[in-house]
């Protein structure tokens, strides 16, 4: 298997590592299982009708490949928790493939996060339980090693963004985590979907500082963010431009359903808030 780098941002030296077998072809075969290991971004990627997991599966099907998803995203999870449940949630399901989306919470959770390495763990930034969480480098390497030992082919996803202000402190902190993922993917010779580079490129191109371009809250995906994630994963799985166009042509019904679901959720949230406020007001009047 040889790998081709698709350059996204020359000034970032960012790339997608795409599997290629001499003749370009989609790596996933009909009937294969794909596990999607991750946090709330991945949980939403399956839970939402327009989530990236569903778009990936629909995109493959549009190209004649019926793949079976194994959803394995849990809200709030970090690298140590994903490692702890790897066998139960992924390996026991015997998938042929596994995408790994991990890193946002390791950084975003601050003192409760997971340090990149042993040196970072000793900076005094973390709480007194940090030693029980290990380090990001060790946890991610163990996940990849265990998956490969079980015959599962991993696809690495760089962590997206923490706030769409690319100069935020959190985005600065997550950069070395993503640099490690790129290097590990290269060393292990596994496909890399450099989603962080794709997100940075898109946010800069849009140039709308006060508008959420790809996320609903700076972290979790909106419809456009899910689409961009799906494109990155499908590219890493070997889809060419024509195949990606086929995939994207299958998405509008899912996008519409996702928008409707988001609207209903927002309405329900607003209604619940109004009812709570009214109840509190009634209580004060007694």
Task: Please provide the spans of the model-predicted regions.
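Short beta->alpha junction loops
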Residues: 71-78
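A structural signal for the hydrophobic beta-strands that form the central parallel beta-sheet
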Residues: 36-37, 71, 156, 215
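Boundary at the C-terminal end of the N-terminal hydrophobic targeting segment
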Residues: 22-24
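Bacterial N-terminal signal peptides that target proteins for export
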Residues: 1-10
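Catalytic nucleophile-elbow at a beta strand-turn-alpha helix junction centered on a G-D-S/GDSL motif
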Residues: 32-47, 78, 107
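Alpha-helical cap/lid subdomain in secreted, periplasmic
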Residues: 28-30, 50, 54-66, 80-285
